[in-house]
From Swiss-Prot:
Protein name: Protein TOS6
Propeptide: 76-97
Lipidation (GPI-anchor amidated glycine): G75
Key words of the record: Cell wall, Glycoprotein, GPI-anchor, Lipoprotein, Membrane, Secreted, Signal
Family statement drawn from the similarity comment of this UniProt entry: Belongs to the TOS6 family.
GO cellular component assignments: extracellular region; side of membrane
Residues bearing attached sugar chains per UniProt: N64
Species for this entry: Debaryomyces hansenii (strain ATCC 36239 / CBS 767 / BCRC 21394 / JCM 1990 / NBRC 0083 / IGC 2968) (Yeast)
């Protein structure tokens, strides 16, 4: 009885966490161009104009009163795996009786 309960918990935990993926970027390199050869016609280091921004600019701090919408509906919770894990645990509890 105890082995089946432990096995059921292990299977349920593995099922719930099966969709969790962790990625680590180990290949990115940041390069800043500070100077170019005189033959380069479009050198970013010689740029005299400010970059064009498509975002509206406001000079008043009070004008920006909108709150960013943040969603917590993502990852494993969005796929219903927690519900499947709970169902598996409930089934195991019924079998243990």
């Amino acid at each position: 009885m105890q082995f089946s309960t432990v096995a059921l918990f292990a299977v349920a935990a593995a099922f719930v966490s099966a969709d969790v993926v962790t990625e680590v970027d180990t290949q990115s390199t940041l390069v800043t161009i500070t100077d170019c050869d005189s033959t380069v016609t479009d050198c970013p280091a010689r740029q005299t104009e400010a970059p064009v921004s498509s975002a509206p600019v406001s000079s008043s701090a009070a004008a920006n009163t909108t709150v960013a919408g943040v969603s917590t509906y993502e990852g494993a919770a969005a796929k219903g795996q927690y519900a499947a894990g709970v169902a598996a645990l409930a089934a195991g509890a019924l079998l243990a009786l």
